[in-house]
């Protein structure tokens, strides 16, 4: 069996085009364009690349993009003060603070300072809690982007045995909640899981997010499984690969995401969707 490739690049472009049309319609109706503030502290090269792609996507769809590039020496108090100002700014619908933050700044405190209505990354405990309660509002971008991919490929997830490898707050844990909402029987594995291979071999839908190149061998994949590879790992030769051995897995899976060009573009596309949603649901003038 040769797997069908899930083309995240194409689906992400569709999502962005849909958002751009909605933004044009808003402006034509006399409403303002959504605004996103992107905050980068320090000069981490990978973070700079991610931030640049987010800003570019904003401008492409017609958002107002505001950039805050702060020096490595920025204190936690200064960063929190900026977030307070952005929370109070009525032209800003979304606030994105690029992680990781420099040593000495508490990630949790910073993310919790962002108002839940402007938490377009979907990391605030309020928004994660809404997802757990089956009443999601702004959803974590990577898990939501994966669900969008499955929906756009008309993959019926109800009743599937889904296995999530990796239990991070950014992907693994919220992904498990999204899969429950999507009707899956969901298992989350982590560093203490025994007999990982057994879980993988029984997965109808496998989502891998550990950040280790080639962590899952292709011969572990169940025949006909759907494989979603969230890993983005740069090898010493410069090649970018996922957490799954792609060539081998693609021989057994029914669908598989490539790396690059699979999940990555959907994360940014979902951020754009979330910013529009925040603008419409929380910050537009409400009819009395």
Curated annotation (Swiss-Prot):
CDD domains: NAD_bind_m-THF_DH_Cyclohyd. SUPFAM superfamilies: Aminoacid dehydrogenase-like, N-terminal domain, NAD(P)-binding Rossmann-fold domains. One of its GO terms (biological process) is tetrahydrofolate interconversion. Pfam families: THF_DHG_CYH, THF_DHG_CYH_C. NADP(+) binds at residues 166-168, 232. Pathway: One-carbon metabolism; tetrahydrofolate interconversion. One of its GO terms (cellular component) is cytosol. InterPro entries: Aminoacid_DH-like_N_sf, NAD(P)-bd_dom_sf, THF_DH/CycHdrlase, THF_DH/CycHdrlase_cat_dom, THF_DH/CycHdrlase_CS, THF_DH/CycHdrlase_NAD-bd_dom. Keywords: Amino-acid biosynthesis, Histidine biosynthesis, Hydrolase, Methionine biosynthesis, Multifunctional enzyme, NADP, One-carbon metabolism, Oxidoreductase, Purine biosynthesis. Its EC number is 1.5.1.5, 3.5.4.9. GO terms for molecular function: methenyltetrahydrofolate cyclohydrolase activity; methylenetetrahydrofolate dehydrogenase (NADP+) activity. It catalyses: (6R)-5,10-methylene-5,6,7,8-tetrahydrofolate + NADP(+) = (6R)-5,10-methenyltetrahydrofolate + NADPH; (6R)-5,10-methenyltetrahydrofolate + H2O = (6R)-10-formyltetrahydrofolate + H(+). Belongs to the tetrahydrofolate dehydrogenase/cyclohydrolase family. PANTHER family: C-1-TETRAHYDROFOLATE SYNTHASE, CYTOPLASMIC (PTHR48099:SF5), C-1-TETRAHYDROFOLATE SYNTHASE, CYTOPLASMIC-RELATED (PTHR48099). Homodimer. Catalyzes the oxidation of 5,10-methylenetetrahydrofolate to 5,10-methenyltetrahydrofolate and then the hydrolysis of 5,10-methenyltetrahydrofolate to 10-formyltetrahydrofolate. This is Bifunctional protein FolD.
